From Swiss-Prot:
Catalyzes the transfer of the diacylglyceryl group from phosphatidylglycerol to the sulfhydryl group of the N-terminal cysteine of a prolipoprotein, the first step in the formation of mature lipoproteins. A 1,2-diacyl-sn-glycero-3-phospho-(1'-sn-glycerol) binds at R139. It is found in: Cell inner membrane. The gene is lgt. The keyword Transferase applies. It is an enzyme of class 2 (transferase). This is Phosphatidylglycerol--prolipoprotein diacylglyceryl transferase. Signal peptide: none annotated. It comes from Neisseria meningitidis serogroup C / serotype 2a (strain ATCC 700532 / DSM 15464 / FAM18). Coiled coil: none annotated. Pathway: Protein modification; lipoprotein biosynthesis (diacylglyceryl transfer). It comes from the Bacteria. The chain crosses the membrane at residues 17-37, 56-76, 92-112, 117-137, 194-214, 222-242, 255-275.
């Protein structure tokens, strides 16, 4: 079993100011978005100009941060934040939701499109291929923080990783499983899936490769966005089987996690949209 290296979450500290790895992962994501966006402009595959891309980035950042935070509050810990509403503003303590961030960006795209006279679906198609590498960067941030670890796996599996930060969850899980209790006593922690790295590979690298290559040619309006929507939903749904469910929610109906249930509409809408927009080309 490999032990998580327990990186210092703070990259640089100057007096009271601290630059955290997690914040850096977001910054890197926005840099990659801009770099890829300019590549697409140069290739003639974008509705953006260099100036409008920079303008949209501001809208996108607001959508990611506000939507991601509100999504986490509403989808995952609503009762806690209802009791302590000021904690909503403590973003530095963590707590962001992709699905909330996605909805925030969709709203930003709609507002930006109205302002600049760009069709919503055309703008969605342009933005979709620029997003996955940013998601990959965010998952590396999760891994460095040692958060969002995976479910317990076999002690002899080559991918098995112990997360010192999960000791409380390890003890709770071992209380209901004699074999896990034996492992915990022997190794001090349970072997878990490094699910952050699975999500990095699936939602980040694989999704980027699929959407980027598909969008290198002109496609029917709405089809690229649908591919991203359905592709993310499928990859996230798969990865959630290895990810530890949130302790305050656990598994929901049909033994699925909140992340899986939030991904189901994305899968359905993505598949329906991909087929429907593709059929329009045939007519």
């Amino acid at each position: 079993m490999i032990i998580h290296p327990q990186f210092d979450p703070v990259l640089i500290s100057i007096g009271p100011l601290a630059v955290r790895w997690y914040a850096l992962s977001y910054i890197l994501g926005f840099i990659l978005f801009t770099f890829l966006g300019r590549r697409r402009i140069a290739q003639g595959l974008s509705v953006f100009t260099k100036e409008s891309l920079d303008d949209f980035l501001t809208w996108g950042i607001l959508g990611v941060i506000l939507g991601g935070r509100l999504g986490y509050v509403l989808f995952y810990k609503f009762s806690d934040y209802l009791a302590h509403p000021l904690d909503i503003f403590k973003v530095w303590e963590g707590g962001m939701s992709f699905h909330g961030g996605f909805l925030g960006v969709v709203i930003a795209i709609w507002l930006f499109g109205r302002k600049h006279g760009i069709g919503f679906l055309k703008l969605m198609d342009t933005v979709a291929p620029l997003v996955p590498l940013g998601l990959a960067s965010g998952r590396i941030g999760n891994f460095i923080n040692g958060e969002l670890w995976g479910r317990v796996t076999d002690i002899n599996a080559f991918w098995a990783m112990g997360f010192p930060q999960a000791r409380y969850e390890d003890a709770e899980a071992a209380a209901h499983n004699p074999l896990w209790a034996e492992w915990l006593q022997q190794y001090g922690m349970l072997p878990r899936h490094p699910s952050q790295l699975y999500q990095f590979a699936l939602e980040g690298i694989c999704l980027f490769a699929v959407v980027w290559l598909f969008s290198k040619k002109q496609r029917p309006t709405g089809q690229v966005a649908s591919l991203f929507l359905g592709g993310y939903g499928i990859f996230r749904f798969i990865a959630e089987f290895a990810r530890q469910p949130d302790d305050y929610l656990g598994l929901l109906t049909l033994g699925l996690s909140m992340g899986q249930w939030l991904s189901v509409p994305m899968i359905v809408l993505g598949i329906v949209g991909f087929v429907r927009f593709g059929m329009k080309k045939q007519h």
